[in-house]
Amino acid sequence: MQKISLNRDERLNNNPNLNTKSIEIVSKILSKNDLKAQELREIYRSLGLYVVNLMSSPGSGKTTFLESLSTYTDMRFCVLEGDLQTNRDALRLEEKGVSAYQITTGEACHLEAAMIESALEALQKQCDMRQMEYLFIENVGNLVCPASYDLGAGLNIVLLSIPEGDDKVLKYPTMFMCADAVIVSKADMMGYFDFRLERVKSDLAQLKANVPLFRVSSKERESVIKVRDFIAERRTQGYCSTHQF
């Protein structure tokens, strides 16, 4: 199997599409984002928020998972929604009684720390964030770019839906190296697709040891509760993702 680059500098330097000047520019952008992400950690801490960054392909079920948390649990949370256009996902959550603020990125395929900082100020005008336990950031649907931008989250959770197939982990290794946990979503569709859960587990193990994996269906309350319990445990532990973006 082709060697997988685990280090950011190594990935940049080995990219045939980037020359020396381009690598320098990208490195500066990412370094600036890293500094802002560190500032965000202090802001989250001051607000008493435990932050979870949800990443996946478009349509993998990030918004549906958040709706399920609202339906099946008593978690006190608010949401920052990332999409290129429209506020449809934010409206879906608001209909469930969840305070949500939509970030529309235009042509940008990911959220950046500076976007979160300004959106957080807007969200604070919508709800009393000190009454919240958690902030969920629903990143732009994309298995590539969000993996390069630290948002200061305590947990980075990646969703992989059954219809996407079981081969994505090693095809998009940078994303799954970010993962503090992986949710295999739309688990109720397992019987309709040739999806090998053991392959996903094996591929994950090649990238990162002991990544918790959850099978989740929005139709199965207990599957959602297991993820809720995992997130709550990490919050109690004060866990902060050690992944270096």
For each feature predicted by the language model, list its residue ranges.
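Nucleotide-state-sensitive switch-loop elements of NTP-binding domains
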Residues: 16-55, 60, 69-154, 165-167, ...
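Canonical P-loop GTPase G-domain recognition
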Residues: 189-245
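Long, basic/Gly/Ser/Thr-rich N-terminal segments
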Residues: 1-12
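Walker A/P-loop
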Residues: 63
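Conserved C-terminal guanine-recognition region of P-loop GTPase G domains, centered on the G4
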Residues: 146-153, 162-211
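Cofactor-binding loop segments of dinucleotide-utilizing enzymes, especially the Rossmann-like FAD-
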Residues: 82, 161-162, 218
